[in-house]
Each structure stands twice: as C-alpha cells, then as structure tokens.
Amino acid sequence: LYIVGGGDPTIASKDSIAIPHAKLFAQWKSFLDKAGIKKINGKVIGDGRYFDGPIEHDTWSYQDIGTAYGAGGNGLCFYENAQDFRVSAGPSVGSPVNVTVSFPNTPWMRYEYPCRTAPAGTGDQLYLFNSEFLPYAEIRGSFAIDRKPKTEEFSNKFGAYTCAHYFCEYLKS
C-alpha cells in the first residue's frame, strides 16, 4: 500500500487546523474498506516525493537543520517532520544528559547521545545531527545542570516513513 503525499504539512501536526491523526487514519481506512481491501499482504510505504530536491535549502546552517524549525517539508510529512525528546540534566557536571524519544516513536532509528551535563548558567546547547541517508542521529552539545527537564523538539528526516509506520500501527489496532 502506497501513501502518496500531496504536500500537506499538517498530518499529525500540533497545529489547531490539523485533523488528529487517528481521525485521519480512520478516514484512510474507510477508503480501503470501500475499495474492498481487507488485508495488506506486504508493506505500507510512505511516498514523500511530491516536491523536487532536498527538504531543506542548501544555505541553511547545519546546526539549524537538526532543530524542529529546520526540519523542512516534503510531500508526506508527519508531525511537521519534527520529533520530541524529553531531556534532563545528569546528576553531575560532565555526566551524560538523560534523553528519551517522546513522539513520534521511530523504532527503526538508532540514536546516540554524546551530550553532557554542563555547569549552571550555560543553558541548553543541544543539537541534533541527522541525515535522510541513514536511520542514525546524534544529540550533541550540553544541557546545564540547573535547567529543568523539558521537551526538546528536533527534526525528523523520515516523515513519510513515520507516517506509514503510524498508519500501519493504526491498521493493526
């Protein structure tokens, strides 16, 4: 089953105009039902090729590309091609920052967190480094020991794949 995107950036978006993804997926499932499709014997594939070229402009700063506002858009976005991570300082300066994926879950991704807890007053200097060429990303930088735990929003280079994954999970439920 191919999900061919048409450039809508609001699928699963937090934006107030967005249709909740469960409601949208129910609508998609009704299309399958009307077509007589009861079971998918294969894969659900998200096709985000609606636009030509890379999803971000080549003049954008590499540090900005990993942030949510640098996610860029493609033909099939999911959650604005962003991803939330829960972050908190480690127990001491120099210790690893505590990082967990919040939403959307991307089980095919491999994440590494070489980021460290920094001295008080140094703020949030976390940056995600990722690429659309392989399912790997690193959160680098530092997070001050005096900062409260927070949700950090970074880019997801696999919006189309994420949309297909969530629709597939919806169909299984």
Predicted segments with their positions:
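Conserved serine DD-peptidase/penicillin-binding transpeptidase domain
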Residues: 1-173
